[in-house]
């Protein structure tokens, strides 16, 4: 008995060598969401949603925007006298127009297919203005008298700079027949108009002829216009109206004009010298003297993140727009420091290293690794190979998400005239619906990728554990907490061989077998002793019980409580 007690004491005092498999932990409080859980604390995370801008209008890749200030696109193209600063403009990256610019059509009227023209401008980066019909060439008509107080310049009546309002001369208005052949290599934007007088008296006063027309023709256009004489309310002091038209004249095509009155003739046209990605943005901002790769109406974005929630309308190399308020991608592991002793929940993908109850804050040079203890001491060592593979996989995750979302829906900010409000409302609903779906897809993708990332790390820890288990086999005992207890002495060289996969099982198998047998013998001898003590205890207890029963019976017989024969 004394031998057994002494052996057990010796065994308990000699601590076996151990190696444990674990993972990195730190003091991070960053949290991500997954398919299965919300607010999961992780060691590392990356915010992939840009939420900030600089509140300025900037150059786009070094090219200035065309900021029209108080002028509209129509005021710029026709040449409103208050927009003279834009008579000749350099190349632009995008066009900025206020929501309600003051200098629009100074003479009241409308611009036919104006929204379509704006859409065309969203694919143009530079105009070159050229003269196609000189003002001085109208010898049979008054080319300088067509002015209005509605379009003042320096306190005097004026008119749009790029067109000519032709009036009768010497009480006659000869029929006009003019042509222009586009000999340029570029397309040409040509503008003209028709004047609608207030009454018949104004018609004859300006054009002499009571019944007039305007005919315009190209290889693709066949237009005949007649003035609409009607009494109207005054706008800008005018009861008349001017309606403007435009067309794109292809190279080697000709445009032909014929009219006997009410003609607003083109003097200048715009040669489209550079096409490319542009946009017309509605913004009240001023020029910020800055440069960017991505511009929105409310400010520039300088970000390498794949998503943003700033504004759906953008131009340039921009992140994808979503309506989300938070998109955080897990790039590290579940952060469960060992002191918390908190088991991880099972995920949706991959193997789970749930048998390891916490991470190691002492292991700082890798995501997964080992902790050993032997006679030479103890320490941490990262598994560089599995860590590097994991880093490579996670590093490509953002690019993977971008690739999966590379069919970005673009809200182009189309404009509609007053007759197309139902179409505009339908378009807005469709765009909102697309953006809702796009946002849902982005959020779902991030949730699934986070789930995969965390379970990917769990799987890597489990694989590392299995790698050690398959090497050690019965030379060590699994303790159930990610650790192995060796049945032999394992110095630092031995520990390193386990870590790098070169552990020599036969070298240590004999020592391990003897240790196992020694432990088994102690257990068996202990079990035998316990059996003898158990039998002795049982017999002694039974004998004592019998004596007590006999004594009780004799006492009862002596006092007559029990009849004895």
Swiss-Prot record:
A lipid is attached at residues 557, 564 (S-palmitoyl cysteine). The keyword Nucleotide-binding does not apply. The chain crosses the membrane at residues 532-552. Residues 1-16 form the signal peptide. GO terms for biological process: clathrin-dependent endocytosis of virus by host cell; fusion of virus membrane with host endosome membrane; fusion of virus membrane with host plasma membrane; virion attachment to host cell. Palmitoylated. In natural infection, inactive HA is matured into HA1 and HA2 outside the cell by one or more trypsin-like, arginine-specific endoprotease secreted by the bronchial epithelial cells. One identified protease that may be involved in this process is secreted in lungs by club cells. Homotrimer of disulfide-linked HA1-HA2. Binds to sialic acid-containing receptors on the cell surface, bringing about the attachment of the virus particle to the cell. This attachment induces virion internalization either through clathrin-dependent endocytosis or through clathrin- and caveolin-independent pathway. Plays a major role in the determination of host range restriction and virulence. Class I viral fusion protein. Responsible for penetration of the virus into the cell cytoplasm by mediating the fusion of the membrane of the endocytosed virus particle with the endosomal membrane. Belongs to the influenza viruses hemagglutinin family. This is Hemagglutinin. It comes from Influenza A virus (strain A/Chicken/Shantou/4231/2003 H5N1 genotype V).
